[in-house]
Regions:
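Signature of N-terminal electron-transfer/Fe-S-associated modules in redox systems
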Residues: 1-169, 173-174, 189
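Flexible, low-hydrophobicity surface segments
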Residues: 154-282
């Protein structure tokens, strides 16, 4: 065990921790600062980026034993609020950068360090900075992220206000406009919880689901024997296709015009056939 005194979002915290814990685990598990996300867990995606002593830090690979006492750590929860967004958070919302929103906190923390050290970056410098700090996004194509940083820089330089960033409908119509995504503010402030975040905040006796997925790309199912699993300690129930009420089918997965089925071809839980690697079985 190690004793650490850390200054997290301006507040001094004294913690007794396992030396093998990562900074991300301390933030998420001990302090419930779940705005810090864990994506790859190997320091390659930037979702876990926080600021430590003024530098972008990949918290998922930073052992707490290597963090100095009184290190100053900033997370997404510490740079703005739902009512008073940081200019980067406001720009993220305005440009639609927070789509799924999982990568947004890591990007914003990286961008904050960039603008603190370079108030007038070029677009190329923004791209290079995100590459350097391993920030990855699967939703946006990156252009809106760079646009957001450039506009946030203007706000910080006093060339425009946060209010100037936001779309304002003039005819009460928002369809086809840049009207802000309703979930955007929650996602850029770290208050939008994903499944891995929700579980940190649930009662200790909350049941958890472990998904059994197909490990082959195609197969015919002759039977599913759940007896051994049901007898394992801690198992409350094993759910298979037999437990699905009504029609064990999901639509919307196959929507190509060439599809010959009725749109209800895929099971919720596999019953007769495995269609692809990773299909849910139980």
């Amino acid at each position: 065990m190690v004793k650490k005194v850390l200054v997290i979002n301006g507040m001094e915290r004294t913690l007794v921790l396992e030396g093998t814990e990562t900074l991300a685990e301390v933030l998420r598990d001990r302090l419930l600062l779940t705005g810090c996300k864990i994506g790859c867990g190997q320091g390659h995606c930037g979702a876990c980026n926080v600021i430590m002593d003024g530098k972008v830090t990949r918290s998922c690979i930073t052992r707490i034993s290597k963090v100095r006492d009184y290190a100053r750590i900033e997370t997404i929860e510490g740079i703005g609020t739902l009512e008073n967004l940081h200019p980067l958070q406001a720009a993220w919302v305005a440009h639609g950068c927070a789509q799924c929103g999982f990568c947004s906190p890591g990007f914003i923390m990286s961008a904050k360090v960039l603008l603190e050290n370079n108030p007038s970056p070029t677009r190329e410098e923004v791209r290079d900075w995100f590459n350097k700090n391993r920030n990855l996004c699967r939703c946006t194509g990156y252009k809106p992220l760079i646009d957001a940083v450039m506009d946030a820089a203007k706000v910080l330089r006093g060339e425009m206000s946060k209010e100037d960033l936001m779309f304002k409908p003039t005819d009460n119509k928002i369809l086809g406009t840049t009207y802000a995504r309703p979930s955007g503010i929650a996602k850029v402030t770290g208050s939008w919880d994903f499944g891995a975040d929700e579980i940190k905040k649930m009662p200790e006796d909350t049941l958890q689901i472990a998904l059994v997925q197909a490990e082959v790309s195609h197969a015919l199912i002759k039977g599913i024997d759940t007896s051994e699993a049901e007898n394992m300690p801690g198992v409350y129930k094993v759910i298979t296709y037999k437990d699905v009420p009504g029609k064990n089918r999901i639509t919307g997965l196959i929507t190509f015009p060439t599809n010959k089925g009725d749109g209800w071809d895929r099971p919720i839980l596999c019953d007769e056939k495995v269609f692809q690697y990773g299909d849910a079985i139980a």
